[in-house]
């Protein structure tokens, strides 16, 4: 049944992913969605549209051999890596740009979502702080970047332990619409344009006067993650809490970004200004600051969005250009490990499927196949007695027919009983292997706030001559006694993006403790296991690109860290407030959290310790350190694997390995006879008794020795 105009408008405004025609195959599907949403606003008029005013610009990656085309069509250019640019593009001009052969691709993706007292001991960061040189490190001389939401900039945790030094050096608040602070200027080979989102604040006075990020009255996440990575544990007045972060002497550069969690404070007309390309500008902002002060840098990104097969070609290319010696990005694996996320129908199998489920009103999925997909939906509703459900409609579709539709996108509205379900299908060449087909499927429960409120829906892929993989997006899978044969799902392929990217350090969560005592003396906590077992929620690989993920694990349950004292609805006097203290007339808090979001900054902080002793470490070298030093919960498994990666990080073993392999400093036993020994200051000594660094000459060679 064809959709009516009103239904089309409603459908275009869903969180769908739409594809391209041959002429617009240069666009990622999210860019295509932005254009169609913009067209819907124009077609149906402002009176029927939820948008007030113009939709504004789209922040996107553009690969082009002619930069003048971007200027011609009113684009502002914020950054470039050779012929790849990040630019704001007027939405009305995107299609026209794509008509030029010099424009090779325009890409953007949807915004992300957010995904330690004992942690420092478990992963031996405290042992690193307390060791003698060259094993000792505290993060001094290293920049930790944090891109997140909900920052309390006044928490004493950001000072040095003695409260003499405020360690946040600058912040770009992408959601700040005030006239305070300073604009952020994008720098490219062809000129400098002012970036049209947010304001930056530089220096202690400006940052403390700001007090909190623009979303600070409703969010807290970044205050917690940054505390785990680099909090000093300070409460002021000479008091140090037990909740010191992994790298307590590192300095910080912060970006407060846009996510699905804080989007309500941004005008809907500005939604396409905030994309994955905008997040790349945030990473660049942090790395540029580190470059300006000549220090190594590791960024914590405890956010992500579901992976796909076509959104991120340019994103990954640019990210690979950013990362390298002394430039590291850590990203959370995500918390979807307990969801049923994947179906595989091999050649020779006639049918595989499951029932659909979603926490929102729509469920979307992507598929990879050798041939166009044939699929089937069955809708079950109450029978006339109202006591049991029966199959009311069976809907089948062969995607070979999509070529007959405009832009190879099929939209339909199905009337099942008295309820409407909008369906959208599209197909295109697969990103990683052009010989394969990628397809997208979205179904929305138009008349209800939650998906499948009154109707159970099963899904199956068909055809013994085709190999088909189905991956979750906004929906997942479940079983149902209405058809017990449809339970072909697996709990794999749940690593979020950009954690799925090869050169990103992907962090999963382990469990060690089951309780935390709050400031009131009450005992709370979540029991996900002990002794370093993977939590059930921690994302599982492989990534859609085939990479083994995660790379490494860290504690992610019952983690106590700093939290945002400005959040109005947090009610920190309850179980989440593990400790309360007052500094300069304001109450501040330590609170409990869980998730791969909490595990990721522990790894970020440990890598900062490692960068202190070897500032040129690359992502590949860090993974080599993991391979030789991580601890293994289950020795019967081979490592790396798609559950634990290389295992749980060990800060001290890592530094020992780095010193031995990458800095040339190692600890070993020597015979002093026949050798001339000098201390680090060049003074001759008779023998080696104290711990320290020595220079030894035996007439054949000169070498460093560490005791």
Where are these regions (language model features)?
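Subtilisin-like serine protease catalytic core
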Residues: 130-275, 294-298, 311, 324-328, ...
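Short acidic, glycine-rich surface-loop motifs adjacent to enzyme active sites
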Residues: 257, 281-310, 332, 455-465, ...
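Autoinhibitory N-terminal propeptides
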Residues: 19-135, 143, 261
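N-terminal domain-start motif of subtilase-like serine proteases
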Residues: 30-52, 93, 112-164, 204-221, ...
């Amino acid at each position: 049944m064809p959709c009516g105009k009103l239904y089309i408008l409603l459908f275009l405004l869903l969180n769908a992913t739409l594809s391209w025609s041959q002429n617009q195959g240069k666009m990622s599907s999210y860019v295509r969605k932005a254009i169609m949403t913009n067209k819907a606003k124009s077609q149906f008029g402002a009176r029927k549209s939820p948008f007030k005013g113009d939709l504004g610009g789209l922040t996107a990656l553009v690969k082009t051999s002619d930069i003048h085309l971007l200027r011609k069509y009113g684009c502002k250019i914020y950054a470039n890596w050779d012929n790849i640019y990040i630019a704001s593009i007027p939405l009305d001009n995107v299609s026209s740009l794509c008509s030029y052969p010099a424009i090779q691709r325009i890409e953007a993706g949807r915004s992300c979502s957010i995904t330690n007292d004992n942690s420092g001991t478990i992963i031996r960061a405290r042992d690193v702080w307390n060791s003698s040189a060259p094993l000792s490190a505290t993060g001094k001389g290293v920049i930790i970047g944090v891109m997140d939401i909900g920052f309390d900039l006044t928490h004493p945790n950001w000072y040095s332990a003695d409260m003499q030094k405020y360690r946040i050096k600058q912040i770009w608040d992408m959601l700040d619409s005030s006239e305070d602070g300073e604009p952020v200027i994008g720098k490219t080979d062809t000129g400098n344009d002012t970036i049209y989102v947010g304001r930056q604040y530089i220096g202690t006075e400006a940052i403390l006067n700001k007090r909190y990020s623009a979303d600070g009255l409703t969010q807290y996440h970044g205050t917690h993650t940054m505390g785990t990575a680099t909090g000093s544990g300070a409460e002021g007045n000479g008091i140090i809490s037990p909740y010191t972060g992994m790298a307590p002497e590192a300095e910080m550069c912060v970006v407060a970004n846009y996510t699905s969690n804080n989007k309500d404070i941004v005008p809907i007309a500005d939604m396409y200004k905030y994309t994955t390309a905008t997040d790349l500008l945030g990473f660049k902002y942090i790395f540029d600051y580190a470059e300006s002060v000549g220090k190594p840098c590791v960024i914590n990104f405890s956010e992500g969005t579901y992976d796909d097969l076509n959104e991120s070609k340019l994103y990954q290319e640019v990210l690979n250009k950013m990362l390298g010696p002394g430039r590291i990005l850590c990203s959370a694996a995500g918390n979807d490990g307990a969801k049923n996320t994947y179906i595989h129908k091999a050649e020779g199998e006639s049918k595989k499927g499951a029932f659909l489920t979603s926490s929102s009103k729509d469920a979307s999925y992507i598929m990879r196949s050798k041939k166009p997909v044939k699929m089937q939906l069955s809708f079950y509703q109450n029978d006339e007695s109202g006591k049991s459900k029966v199959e009311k409609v069976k809907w089948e579709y062969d995607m070979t027919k999509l070529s007959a539709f405009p832009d190879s996108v099929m939209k339909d509205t199905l009337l099942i009983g008295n309820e409407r379900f909008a369906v959208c299908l599209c197909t295109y060449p697969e990103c990683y292997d052009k010989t394969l087909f990628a397809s997208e499927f979205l179904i929305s429960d138009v008349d209800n706030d939650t998906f499948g409120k009154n109707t159970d829906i099963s899904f199956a892929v068909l055809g013994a001559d085709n190999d088909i993989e189905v991956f979750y997006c906004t929906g997942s899978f479940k079983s149902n006694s209405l058809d017990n044969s449809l339970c072909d799902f697996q709990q794999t392929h749940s690593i979020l993006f950009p954690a799925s990217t090869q050169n990103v350090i992907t962090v999963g969560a382990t469990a060690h403790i089951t309780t935390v005592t709050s400031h009131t003396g009450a005992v709370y906590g979540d029991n996900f296991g002990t002794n370093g077992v993977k939590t059930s929620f921690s994302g599982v690989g492989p990534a859609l690109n085939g990479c083994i993920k995660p790379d490494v694990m860290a504690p992610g349950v019952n983690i106590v860290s700093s939290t945002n004292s400005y959040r109005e609805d947090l009610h920190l006097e309850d179980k989440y407030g593990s400790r309360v203290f007052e500094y300069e007339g304001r109450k501040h808090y330590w609170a409990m959290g869980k998730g791969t979001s909490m595990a990721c900054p522990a790894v970020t902080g440990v890598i900062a310790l490692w960068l202190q002793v070897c500032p040129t470490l690359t992502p590949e070298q860090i993974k080599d350190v993991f391979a030789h030093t991580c601890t293994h919960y289950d020795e019967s498994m081979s490592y790396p694997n798609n559950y634990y990666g290389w295992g749980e990080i060990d800060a001290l073993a890592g530094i020992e390995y780095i010193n031995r392999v990458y800095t040339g400093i190692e600890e070993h036993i020597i015979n002093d006879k026949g050798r001339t020994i000098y201390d680090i200051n060049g003074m001759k000594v008779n023998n080696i008794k104290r711990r320290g660094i020595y220079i030894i000459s035996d007439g054949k060679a000169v070498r460093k020795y560490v005791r």
